[in-house]
């Protein structure tokens, strides 16, 4: 019996009488095959391969030699078509193969694209382990983010600047109130009145209010012990009763001055004083003001329930107390506001990232050696639910979020274990190979066994490689990481980079494979890239292999290690 492994505990088995499907070592379904079909499939499985497909003529000759039978006219093509149909019928409800049971390279020959040994077992176990660990990715990404010291440094700076701004605004508001306060005007008018008497020229007394703000009226007991009321409209003598009524009016704030043997009482209408002060009071800064006069009156403006911030006392007995709106709460709210303003793009990108990884998973894509028919390692590819993955990754790079995702991938593939089950490569942007980013990345890897880990340096045309990056790549090699250059032949990933990094692998971009069969220039370019990799003793990997024709053509050019949809990891 010949077995063709399709994936995890699933294979197609060929016997002389039937072709069957086994799942978990249990027969699931079987379809009879003819002797011709058995002879053809077993011959191709024995003698054909991707690197050396077997032609129809050779197959027919082998069948004649080993089975002592000759195929009828068109018998070969009919048998191949029947076998493909039976294979699809067996597997359609269990796997979605991108390959037929028999693949044909035009004018070259036939081969079986499935191995007769189970090469995926460890890779599938590793994939299952990763799938378990990629659950709750949002919470894990937040945890990684909160351990980033740079965040707390930024917050500390914003808090310091916000605190300085907060108290500066409070001082400015207080100074503005003091500058426009009625006390200075009241003192000026009191000083002027004390030098005159109630019998002075009335127009002159009334004119004292022309350049005075807020002061509504004044009561004077002059040096001749004459009591009078002075207003912008009139000067009239008053009785003691009228004086008391004038002084005790709760709608006014009154201050007394004893100057030049005269007693001057100046009063301001509370509503005018309030309107003048309220323009300097706000919810987040100066919340209120309370003033006391030497006549025993006091007046509150705004909210005076909080903690006082500043007060001043005049020699005249006048006192002002200023209150602020919960400084801690205000500073925190203002800091959050400034953080949103300053980092709104990064915050928006991070929120978008968190939404994208709600259904995030990592797919292991095999890197297959066609000569040994073994997977040499697997690339961990991130899969997001976004419209444009490339643009999404570029957004992460531009907003400094790629490090968080790279650490998330590292933790997912290790799945809380010290080592990997199979060799795995992860993509690392050059921006993570310098400065604080590299320090964090290195610290994450240093605590793990990296002998099966490959760091795949992606192409970034906007970034130049520096001596710092070369030195840091050398540090990764000391951790036993292998190094791979992705997208070789494009952008900055060129020959100069190979000579300085000495990578283990060179990955040729899929753009060189698309349309390869009909483009002689691409064939020649690819041949030169492969030769260049061999010159620098690098293992060359070709990406984007999606068809049997492309896979075989690459082997004729000397590229035997492939990656692409033609080599899926089936469960």
Curated annotation (Swiss-Prot):
Keywords attached to this entry: c-di-GMP, Cell inner membrane, Cell membrane, Hydrolase, Membrane, Transmembrane, Transmembrane helix
CDD domains reported for this sequence: EAL
Molecular function terms from GO: cyclic-guanylate-specific phosphodiesterase activity
Induction (UniProt): Promotes its own expression when the levels of c-di-GMP are low or when its enzyme activity is inhibited.
Membrane topology: Multi-pass membrane protein
Transmembrane segments: 155-175, 321-341, 395-415
Record has rRNA-binding as a keyword: no
Disruption phenotype: Deletion of the gene results in 33% and 61% increase in c-di-GMP levels compared to the wild-type strain in cells grown to the exponential and stationary phases, respectively. Deletion mutant shows a decrease in swimming motility.
InterPro entries in the record: Cyclic-di-GMP_PDE-like, EAL_dom, EAL_sf
Protein EC: 3.1.4.52
Miscellaneous section: Overexpression of the gene results in 52% and 60% decrease in c-di-GMP levels compared to the wild-type strain in cells grown to the exponential and stationary phases, respectively. Overexpression promotes swarming motility and expression of the swarming gene lafA, but it inhibits biofilm formation and expression of the biofilm gene cpsA.
Domain commentary: Contains a putative N-terminal DNA-binding domain, followed by a degenerated GGDEF-like domain and a conserved C-terminal EAL domain.
Role according to the record: Cyclic di-GMP phosphodiesterase that plays an important role in modulating the global c-di-GMP pool. Its ability to alter the c-di-GMP pool has an effect on swimming motility, swarming motility and biofilm formation, multicellular behaviors that are important for the survival and dissemination of this environmental pathogen. Exhibits a dual function, namely, c-di-GMP degradation and modulation of its own expression.
Protein name: Cyclic di-GMP phosphodiesterase TpdA
Species classification: Bacteria, Pseudomonadati, Pseudomonadota, Gammaproteobacteria, Vibrionales
Protein's gene: tpdA
